[in-house]
Amino acid sequence: MAKANSRVKKKAKQVVTDAVAHVHATFNNTIVTITDRQGNALCWATSGGSGFRGSRKSTPFAAQVAAERAGQMATEYGVKNMDVMVKGPGPGRDSAVRGLNSVGFKITSISDVTPIPHNGCRPPKKRRV
């Protein structure tokens, strides 16, 4: 017996005016995640997913492009104001914030949330080239 065709309702996108942009900048990649105030992810973009591969993935320009892509997706949710939380030592820290600013958001605060150990794990040995 075949199941009757029932319409699947598409989930309506919520309207969020205030959001938080989490920029995770590593030495190899930059991940930009935009969440609401409660921490629920709205959209995200990476410099690797923006078409950059290899060593070009870790450039400031790739981080700026990733931030602009995430910002374009966030405008579909009606985001106007944004807090930016930057984590990590990567080269795309500042340019990702500039990319979010160029989309047209009103950036209310920029905070550095890089985790700093209080003498925790032993760091990796120094590179010898």
Swiss-Prot record:
Per the UniProt entry, what are the Gene Ontology biological process annotations, in alphabetical order?
translation
How is this protein organized at the quaternary level?
A: Part of the 30S ribosomal subunit. Interacts with proteins S7 and S18. Binds to IF-3.
Q: Which NCBIfam families match?
A: PRK05309.1 (NF003698), uS11_bact (TIGR03632)
- Family listed: Belongs to the universal ribosomal protein uS11 family.
Can you list the GO cellular component terms from the UniProt entry? Answer: ribonucleoprotein complex; ribosome
- InterPro entries xrefs: Ribosomal_uS11, Ribosomal_uS11_bac-type, Ribosomal_uS11_CS, Ribosomal_uS11_sf
Name-wise, this protein is: Small ribosomal subunit protein uS11
* Organism from which the protein derives: Hydrogenovibrio crunogenus (strain DSM 25203 / XCL-2) (Thiomicrospira crunogena)
GO MF entry, a single one: structural constituent of ribosome
What keywords would UniProt list here? Ribonucleoprotein, Ribosomal protein, RNA-binding, rRNA-binding
What's the stated role of this polypeptide?
Answer: Located on the platform of the 30S subunit, it bridges several disparate RNA helices of the 16S rRNA. Forms part of the Shine-Dalgarno cleft in the 70S ribosome.
